[in-house]
């Protein structure tokens, strides 16, 4: 083999390696960021099809913006803050870029000590941040019925604003704003929102979530236009 042939072979190998590296970077860049909705029956969309639950409606809003984010619905009916903490390890096996934490409502309905709920929710945030330090956190505020007592209600409602402040997280003041207590917007049980109710919840969440997604979408250099549409529907965590 002549010197010129050897040089030509090395040039070919070099170009091939460059192509593979660039292809790998392109695939990595195209991977959507994940929004984990960790919640109870409100997040799960109790009594409705999954596509009617507010996380799926958020995915549609994202697709309309052509932003590259994937919604994972980890809502579980009847779940408490302790239950969410117990199943968190499995959920963190997949990367989490944004956490929407909607837990605590069932704690309040059961009259559990607010301090216990606070500790559990803080532990969830701590574990997610320990695994994914760059995660963005949104805390969804919740209220309890008046029959739980005024003192209990004040202590319970303070949990969410306090957690958001302590963790420099975004706060959805009351995720059921405009829905809670409405006969027309809840199922016969008076607790779980109808499809129309979930549309309002999605609007409540979107007001807080959209600015965060917008800021992150600007860093997604995909296909040269900064973002890529994700047409896949929201997925349910098993």
Q: Predicted segments — roles?
A:
Residues 28-77, 85-96:
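Serine-esterase "nucleophile elbow" of acetyl-processing enzymes
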Residues 42-45, 49, 75-79, 106-108, ...:
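Short histidine/acidic/glycine/proline-rich micro-motifs that form metal-
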Residues 1-10:
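N-terminal secretory signal peptides that target proteins for export/translocation
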Residues 8, 30, 231-233:
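Low-complexity, intrinsically disordered segments with a bias for serine/threonine
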Residues 53, 80, 194:
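Residue-level signal for threonine
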Residues 67, 85-225, 230-231, 236-238:
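Alpha-helical cap/lid subdomain in secreted, periplasmic
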Residues 13-24:
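Bacterial N-terminal signal peptides
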